[in-house]
Amino acid sequence: AYNALAPKGAPNSCEWEQNETAQVDAQELDEEENEANEAQAREQEQAKKTHVYAQAPLSGIKITKEGLQIGTADATVAGAGKEIFADKTFQPEPQVGESQWNEADATAAGGRVLKKTTPMKPCYGSYARPTNSNGGQGVLWLTNGKLESQVEMQFFSTSTNATNEVNNIQPTVVLYSEDVNMETPDTHLSYKPKMGDKNAKVSLGQQAMPNRPNYIAFRDNFIGLMYYNSTGNMGVLAGQASQLNAVVDLQDRNTELSYQLLLDSIGDRTRYFSMWNQAVDSYDPDVRIIENHGTEDELPNYCFPLGGIGITDTFQAVKTTAANGDQGNTTWQKDSTFAERNEIGVGNNFAMEINLNANLWRNFLYSNIALYLPDKLKYNPTNVDISDNPNTYDHMKRVVAPGLVDCYINLGARWSLDYMDNVNPFNHHRNAGLRYRSMLLGNGRYVPFHIQVPQKFFAIKNLLL
């Protein structure tokens, strides 16, 4: 999904085909060898092999031909002790890796990689829509009467062992390769090598930048206000304003709010809402447009290497030997359809703790939106005891999925999430009047009170509240 923190030139984990130089040159053959061997050498010289540049963030227990083992069935359930392997439709999840920086080195690791048939794009701005209920993104194909993603497992061992085909080759990394519906709706390429659209090594260095925002003017904001004042805009009884006992219909909501906003800017009625014990709406400025009323010291900042992966190791692809079948222990051999040098990083990305603008914006959204979202969108942090009482502070301060703010893309438009408009705790935070009432009553979000409206304003109370 969209990731504003990704370096502008970092690729996704990907694959490409490339002509591989043969290990045996036809000119070096002994004179006695026949022409068939020369032709075979020339053909081998032109053979295309798959190259890999990827990250395998998830550590596992071991790797077999079934994939990466990520656990063992609990003793309390049926099949206790049974090995649990990653569900290839969505696991390993690309955002799940080591939980702390000092974890032990992984002896078995797994990750996801895009097949060579998925066009290479920079990670910055890349988006692939989910195709299953677990969040997997593989393209679905009709197989045996049902739609399934075509995920293939690719196994890798340290380059030296596999190349020399020494005994007891064991894979140390497994990549789950798939095609996805790759899109870049919010970015465009700012640098692209001269390679057409096909995947290639030079395309790893593509760079992206965000699209320019296209502002749209609202033509109807002040229709009815620019030409005449019908008194309907004012939200008062017709007889009070015009001295005529005529009824004039109210304008549409957009025009009415615009007029109220104009009155608000040239008058001072909102300064005195506490006098009348009212919570006057801020209308557009404070409710529809996000302002900062929260803490900004919430999240650590990181900076990543330009390639998005940093330190890699060189691996050679391996495959199971066909002779084994399902009997006995699996043995492995070199897979010559892949290049001899495939660069794969194991574990978390190399990073240091800071894109400052992206982090400031992300922190702003987290502290002004995420922290005030309804409780159903929050969850308990791992290993932390949280009260079940929804009115307690620790229950209110549970953590929010980062995706809820990561998917909010600031391209210059002013808009709000659905929850900003129709969820009470959030409106309580956004609304200037309600926010001020909270300051008077204390720093709580759960305060039962009744908003009182003086009867002299009965005709416009719906506009005020």
From Swiss-Prot:
InterPro entries in the record, alphabetically? Answer: Adenovirus_Pll_hexon_N (IPR016107), Adenovirus_Pll_hexon_sub2 (IPR044942), VP_dsDNA_II (IPR016112)
Checking Pfam families in the record gives: Adeno_hexon (PF01065)
Question: GO CC terms on record?
Answer: host cell; host cell nucleus; T=25 icosahedral viral capsid
The induction text for this entry reads:
Expressed in the late phase of the viral replicative cycle.
- Gene3D superfamilies for the chain: Adenovirus Type 2 Hexon, domain 1, Hexon Major Viral Coat Protein, domain 2
What is an annotated GO biological process for this record, any one?
A: microtubule-dependent intracellular transport of viral material towards nucleus
Keywords for the protein's UniProt record, in alphabetical order? Capsid protein, Cytoplasmic inwards viral transport, Host nucleus, Host-virus interaction, Late protein, Microtubular inwards viral transport, T=25 icosahedral capsid protein, Virion, Virus entry into host cell
* Compositionally biased tracts (Acidic residues): 27-36
Highest taxon above the source species: Viruses
Q: Where in the cell is it found?
A: Virion; Host nucleus
Stretch list, region Disordered: 1-51
- Family, per entry: Belongs to the adenoviridae hexon protein family.
* Additional record remark: All late proteins expressed from the major late promoter are produced by alternative splicing and alternative polyadenylation of the same gene giving rise to non-overlapping ORFs. A leader sequence is present in the N-terminus of all these mRNAs and is recognized by the viral shutoff protein to provide expression although conventional translation via ribosome scanning from the cap has been shut off in the host cell.
The record describes its quaternary structure and partners as: Homotrimer. Interacts with the capsid vertex protein; this interaction binds the peripentonal hexons to the neighboring penton base. Interacts with the hexon-linking protein; this interaction tethers the hexons surrounding the penton to those situated in the central plate of the facet. Interacts with the hexon-interlacing protein; this interaction lashes the hexons together. Interacts with host dyneins DYNC1LI1 and DYNC1I2; this interaction might be involved in intracellular microtubule-dependent transport of incoming viral capsid.
What is this protein's name?
Answer: Hexon protein
Q: Specify the species.
A: Human adenovirus C serotype 6
